[in-house]
Amino acid sequence: MTIFNAVDKFTMMSGDRVKIKDLLSSRLTECGWRDEVRLLCRSILQEKGAISSFTVEQLVTEVTPRARSLVPDAVKKELLIKIRTIFDENEADDIDPEEA
């Protein structure tokens, strides 16, 4: 199991996945990332305008690497800190007071 899969499974089971997604969504909106990606999509669609068979899947494939690179480091760092905090809180909850 990869770290990504472990984090995904843990956050889903703990109920924190929604909190993390909400935090990410709000931060990406605040920093203008969503607007940048929207403009990027428009640009690609205009570029490919003559190709009527250009699919949504192809657009996603082309946009995804660029969109990921546009996520500000501060947002990535804040998300990582939030995930670590959730894990730390879970570890603290798992400690048996009689064993400590």
UniProtKB/Swiss-Prot annotation:
GO biological process: chromatin organization; mRNA export from nucleus; positive regulation of transcription by RNA polymerase II; protein transport; transcription elongation by RNA polymerase II
Subcellular location: Nucleus, Nucleoplasm; Cytoplasm
MF-aspect GO terms: chromatin insulator sequence binding; transcription coactivator activity
Coiled coil: none
Keyword entries, A-Z: Activator, Chromatin regulator, Cytoplasm, mRNA transport, Nucleus, Protein transport, Transcription, Transcription regulation, Translocation, Transport
Transmembrane segments: none
Cellular component terms per the entry's GO annotation: cytoplasm; DUBm complex; nuclear pore; nucleoplasm; SAGA complex; transcription export complex 2
InterPro entries found in the cross-reference section: TF_ENY2, TF_EnY2_sf
Cytoplasm listed as a keyword: yes
Family named by the database record: Belongs to the ENY2 family.
Subunit structure: Component of the nuclear pore complex (NPC)-associated AMEX complex (anchoring and mRNA export complex), composed of at least e(y)2 and xmas-2. Component of the SAGA transcription coactivator-HAT complexes, at least composed of Ada2b, e(y)2, Pcaf/Gcn5, Taf10 and Nipped-A/Trrap. Within the SAGA complex, e(y)2, Sgf11, and not/nonstop form an additional subcomplex of SAGA called the DUB module (deubiquitination module). Component of the THO complex, composed of at least e(y)2, HPR1, THO2, THOC5, THOC6 and THOC7. Interacts with e(y)1. Interacts with su(Hw) (via zinc fingers).
Its biological purpose: Involved in mRNA export coupled transcription activation by association with both the AMEX and the SAGA complexes. The SAGA complex is a multiprotein complex that activates transcription by remodeling chromatin and mediating histone acetylation and deubiquitination. Within the SAGA complex, participates in a subcomplex that specifically deubiquitinates histone H2B. The SAGA complex is recruited to specific gene promoters by activators, where it is required for transcription. Required for nuclear receptor-mediated transactivation.
The protein, known as: Enhancer of yellow 2 transcription factor
Organism expressing this protein natively: Drosophila pseudoobscura pseudoobscura
